[in-house]
Amino acid sequence: MDRLAGSALFTAMLVFAGAASAEAQNKQLIQIEADREKDVYRFVPAKVTARAGDVLIFKAVRGSPHSIVFEGRDLSEATHEAINGAMGRRTGDLSSPLLQTDGSEYRIVVPRVAPGVYHFYCLPHRAYEEQGELRIAK
């Protein structure tokens, strides 16, 4: 195989590999709502299944401010660090910044952690049980 053909084949392989990995990364929108009049405080969907590398987009839809805080009680040290590392602009341990206005978003790229269920909640609306769960698939 001459150099030009080999180079073209290598480039095609890189493009294909990039496309395959881009397809493997799923994006999921999780809306966050609070409505005092209707007594509705929720993440929609409240249960999300994802894999490492997937992108979770939390969007404040109504009733801001909102936040995303992961429960840390039963996390191993490595998992705790991985989740903290995935949460850019953290304002505290396992905690996103406040989404101050409706329409604002917060993104998390799911870190490589053990399969299982990870619970999260909205700190400003925790008393109203605004909570959800992230299920990490095998």
Annotated model-derived regions:
Residues 14-21:
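C-terminal segment of classical bacterial N-terminal signal peptides
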